Amino acid sequence: MNQKRCTKKWTAAKRRRQSMTVSESRYRADKTERPGGIRRKYFVIASAQDGMPLEGMMVIPSRPRAVLQIAHGMCEHKERYLPFMRYMAERGYLCVIHDHRGHGASRREAVSADADKVLGKKQDIPAGLGYFGKDGGRFLVRDLHQITRIIKKQYPGLPYFMMGHSMGSLAVRCYLKKYDRELDGLIVCGCPGKNPMAPLGSALIQMLQKMKDPHSRSILADGIFANMFDRPFRAEKLIHAWICSDHTVVEKYNKDPLCNFTFTLNGYESLLWLMRSTYDRKGWEVRNPNLPILFVSGEDDPCLGGRKKLLQAVRHLKRRGYDRVSFRLYPGMRHEILNEKGRFRVYHDIAYFSRVKQEDM
C-alpha cells in the first residue's frame, strides 16, 4: 500500500515537471549535473509582450525546497551562473534563469542596414545582441514576471526568492515596484549606484537614435556608459578589469562573443529606463513591506561608486516602505562578486540569508 502511494506521488511529481514541456515551453534533453540527482533543463518561451524568444535554464535538485530566480547583468548570459546555481541546487534550491532580451539566445536577428555597425565599421557581433526591442526596459521586467508565473504554476507552494546582478539588480527592483507579493526574499547583487547624469544620458541616446538607428552601436555611448569603469584599473592593462580581480575570469569574459560586445542605442535606452525607474520615487505599490531584502556588493566595484552609494540605494527602498533591508560589502572584490576568488563566502551568505528567511516564514 505504501509502495503504491509512493509510486503515485512520484508519477504526479514527474507529470508536474514535464507539463511545462507541453503547455508552456520547449525543453532540451536533461543533463545530469551531480550524482545527487541534480538536473539541468533548457527551455524556450515567447515573451507575452512582443513574442521575443526567451531561452531559459533550470538547475533542479531531486527535492526542491525553494526557488531562486536569477536576473543576469548587461552583456553576459545565463550559463555564466551555472557554478552558483549548482551550489544553490545542492542546498535544495530550484534555480531558474533566462537570457534577457538582446542577450545570449534570447534575441531576434537584426533588421536594420545599420545593425551591428560601430561608426560604419562592421563588428563581429552575433546578430541581435544588445537590442531589446521597443519598450525594452519595461518588457524585460514583465518577462521576469512571466517566468515567475510559469515556475510557480509548475512548483506551487515553494518559497520564492529572486536575485538580480548589475543590470539585473535594476530589473529586480523595478519588478519589486509591482510584483513584490510574488517574493519571499530578494537579493540585490552588484548594484549600480544612482547616477544623476542618467536623464542627460537618455537625452543623448535619443538624439543619437534620431541621427542613426535604434539598432546601431555607438563607441561614444559605450565609452560614456561602460568603458569608464576601467579607469581605476588602467595599470593592469586588461580590458574589463573592473569586473573581477581574477584576470582568468576577465580574460574568459573578453573571449566570449556573448559577453564582449557593444550595446545598441536601443539597448542603452532600455538600460537607462531601468536606472530611472529603479530610483524613481513614484510607482511603488509596496504590498509586501516585510519582504527581506539583501544587498551584496564588492567594495572595489566602480559601478557601485562606494559605500555611500550603496547606503543611498538601501535608504531608497526603506523610504519606499520596505522594513527589512540589509547589506554586505566585500573588501577586495570588484563588480562580479559571484566570480571572485572569495566567491564561496558570497555563495554562503546568500544561501544563509535565504535559509534563515525560510525559517522565519
Where is each model-derived feature located?
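N-terminal cap/lid segment of alpha/beta-hydrolase-fold proteins
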Residues: 21-61
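Active-site glycine-rich loops that stabilize anionic/oxyanionic intermediates
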Residues: 65, 72-76, 166, 299-300
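Conserved alpha/beta-hydrolase
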Residues: 85-124
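Alpha/beta-hydrolase active-site loop
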Residues: 131-152
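Alpha/beta-hydrolase fold nucleophile elbow
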Residues: 155-166
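Alpha/beta-hydrolase-fold enzymes
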Residues: 172-258
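Short beta-strand/loop motif that positions the catalytic acidic residue
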Residues: 295-297
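Catalytic active-site module of serine/aspartate enzymes centered on a nucleophile-bearing elbow/loop
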Residues: 320, 324-361
